[in-house]
Amino acid sequence: MKKILIIICFLTCWLGVSAQSLREVWIEMPDSILPYLSKSQRTELADYVEMKAEPAVLSTFGDSVRIERMTNNYLLLKANEATRLEIKLLDNNTLALVQTWMAPAAESKLSLFNLQWQPKEVVVDYKANIVKPESMSDEDFADLKTLMLPRLKEYRLSADNNSLSVSWNYPLLSKKDVKRVTEILKSQVLNWTGKDFR
């Protein structure tokens, strides 16, 4: 019984530290990542989340900056109509940052840091898996492959686990052609191993 109580106390303390760590990580984020959002505004947003108030402030450009979701280890921020930012605590010494710009097709950048925002090497073991459906002719398959460039990579971090989804956007294609191309190059989900996403 004592062991169970000790474990419960440990888990409770650990969760509290995780929640505090994410708040601190967010507040101490370098200004260079979001130059139009000051440290005091980041603190204000985190306070609003804790108070269950509307977590939104105006940036120096007059855009509404809003925390869409904040948990013990995940944050999703809408910086403006064209910019999304995600932060995920992957382990005790690693956080992932995904910045996505929509202009209008979405393109993302993935960065890894330690909890003091010092950069770490980013390794994403991803190979584009282009597969020809059995019902598709060789000619149609060859035609579709010529449509696949240029393409933009979009990342999404999971709020529920340490996974990273990878999908593709095609800024020059019609909706019809995007649907056709998606049949041969589907999105993938990669998992954090402690060193890389694979």
Segments and roles (model prediction):
Residues 65-68, 84-90, 153-159, 190:
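Short, exposed beta-strand/loop patches in secreted or surface proteins that constitute
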